[in-house]
Amino acid sequence: MRKTSLALAISALLSALPIASVQANESCTPLTGKEAGLDTGRSSAVRCLPGINPLQDLLNSGQNAFSPRGGMAGNDLNLWWAHRTEVLGQGINVAVVDDGLAIAHPDLADNVRPGSKNVVTGGSDPTPTDPDRCPRHSVSGIIAAVDNSIGTLGVAPRVQLQGFNLLDDNIQQLQKDWLYALGQRRHRRQPGLQPELRMSLVDPEGANGLDQVQLDRLFEQRTQHASAAYIKAAGTAFSRIAAGNYVAQPHRNLPKLPFENSNIDPSNSNFWNLVVRAINADGVRSSYSSVGSNVFLSAPGGEYGTDAPAMVTTDLPGCDMGYNRVDDPSTNRLHNNPQLDASCDYNGVMNGTSSATPNTTGAMVLMAPYPDLSVRDLRDLLARNATRLDANQGPVQINYTAANGERRQVTGLEGWERNAAGLWYSPSYGFGLVDVNKTQPCSRQPRTAATTGAVALAKGKGNGRSPSAPSRYVGSSPTRSSTQVDQPLTVEAVQVMVSLDHQRLPDLLIELVSPSGTRSVLLNPNNSLVGQSLDRQQLGYVRTKGLRDMRMLSHKFYGEPAHGEWRLEVTDVANAAAQVSLLDRRTNTRSTLTEGNNSQPGQLLDWSRGYSVLGHDAARS
């Protein structure tokens, strides 16, 4: 045990650090939860947390988290009322599946329960031994750092933790280990925190591979029958991605669209994964955060901790391990600062949707003590009570010249829009920022909503497959194909599985239109599917003809009626040469990859075969 705790050191140094004056404080008294007329919002006059609080995800008062500046007060999970009424995650187990968990860390040891697994050694201690394997250990602190007046505080500080190092570089990832970590040993209402997989996103990947199908089935079964919740990171490649020896990013003159659309990763288009993207301390999308129609919620993720606040959380213990170490200096004032953290057990630079995901996990845990709620009930409550951030966010428009010479403008990605069921949705924020205090009282009330029953599935039928039809050629005017849903369902989400041929996939805008007229961008143009261009440059031939069973998910139609005609639209919105900037990581040299326009039109092959509306009986809504 350290002689000087981080919490005490922060208290002693407050006069020297430009931290906002409104801080959590020791006079912040417990509440019963029965106080009449109490304002539990983010601007409440009684908003506070006990102790000295450097954690803007729990209570953002504008503090700087040891970075040069603070954020905008109120952009947090709004959980102060839940914590002060002793809703702290008691009796809930969380499995963190990633690259390790230091089970002896002073902020985590009291919350670690038996059942962890080190896949490398076969033992029960998944503590990382590689000094660079730190991100997911930091994740555990965001969820479950215990309230011991030593260091940081987790969203659910009395939750129980297990760790599985499935993403350790020293192992072969076997399907049996994934199935064990994600599916077996589950207790009722056990959130499973899924990793942010670092997969290549330059080539499309179908969702019908055996491994993906097995995991999809597992997630469905455990969610439906064992009340397990799976929370997944949207990705951190809004502006650039790593692909082999290169870092690729769009040319600087393109409209500000996401390079990585979160739907490109097939695990992100699984309905049973609740996909989360990150906001920063100013209450807008974190600069790195991937977005897409599959995003369900937003949660704090921060920036990099050097220019603006990141997360303050646990680090691998010791000054030669993790983020906070003597051989890796940082401008974040927590790092290499013996007055604050002599043992280097904490860091102030954790960020990413890998931070937003544990924040959401902890928030769901705080709803979990109510066993009558299904996981879909919890999702419904979180969506309907989320806060609409960046409310004036508008669409990103694309201008292009059609084949007939006409100038056209289309929406490459929507801003905030209200669907036909009256719910606000944005692919950049999902339904909005998690609000624990607003949601938690609703979770105490008996649920009569249809989300308490089994999920209903509607398949489309109609003209979704006709490879030889001339109307299926993909050009500069929308190629439209429709399918009919006859079941009277209320939509929770829609999945489509698209197959098409095209020589330059980043040119394509793919949209889905509901019977109510709501339009959702499933895949934006100017995206990261540049594998065809890289192949031509490096191999002289192309391995990818187009999309094959690429699954995409949209939550934008939540609450709308499913009955009626659904329409897929595919448009080629570029006919000039396209450019991608490349950084060769071996030589640190930069180049520009230039690709001419496709020499022949694309062709939509199929989409209704994998089309599904997931929802519930409209009569029960």
Curated annotation (Swiss-Prot):
Catalytic residues? 98, 137, 354
Q: Where is the composition biased (Polar residues)?
A: 465-485
Free-text function comment from the UniProt entry = Agent of furonculosis.
Q: Which InterPro entries match?
A: Galactose-bd-like_sf, P_dom, Peptidase_S8/S53_dom, Peptidase_S8/S53_dom_sf, Peptidase_S8_Asp-AS, Peptidase_S8_Ser-AS, Peptidase_S8_subtilisin-rel
**Which cellular component, as a GO term, is one annotated location?**
membrane
A GO term (biological process) for this protein? protein processing
Identify the stretch(es) annotated as Disordered.
114-133, 457-485
The answer to whether keyword Protease applies is yes
Protein name listed in UniProt = Microbial serine proteinase
Lyase recorded as keyword: no
Q: Which PROSITE patterns match?
A: P_HOMO_B (PS51829), SUBTILASE (PS51892), SUBTILASE_ASP (PS00136), SUBTILASE_SER (PS00138)
Give, as one word, the top-level EC class: hydrolase
User: What gene is this protein translated from?
Assistant: aspA
Q: Where is the signal peptide?
A: 1-24
Q: Which organism is it from?
A: Aeromonas salmonicida
Q: Which residues form the Peptidase S8 domain?
A: 68-440
Chain ranges of the P/Homo B domain: 454-619
Against Pfam families, the record matches this protein to: P_proprotein, Peptidase_S8
PANTHER family listed in its UniProt record: NEUROENDOCRINE CONVERTASE 1, PROPROTEIN CONVERTASE SUBTILISIN/KEXIN-RELATED
Q: Source organism's superkingdom?
A: Bacteria
Kindly list the GO molecular function terms attached to this UniProt entry.
serine-type endopeptidase activity
Entry EC number(s): 3.4.21.-
Alphabetically list the UniProt keywords: Hydrolase, Protease, Serine protease, Signal
Family assignment? Belongs to the peptidase S8 family.
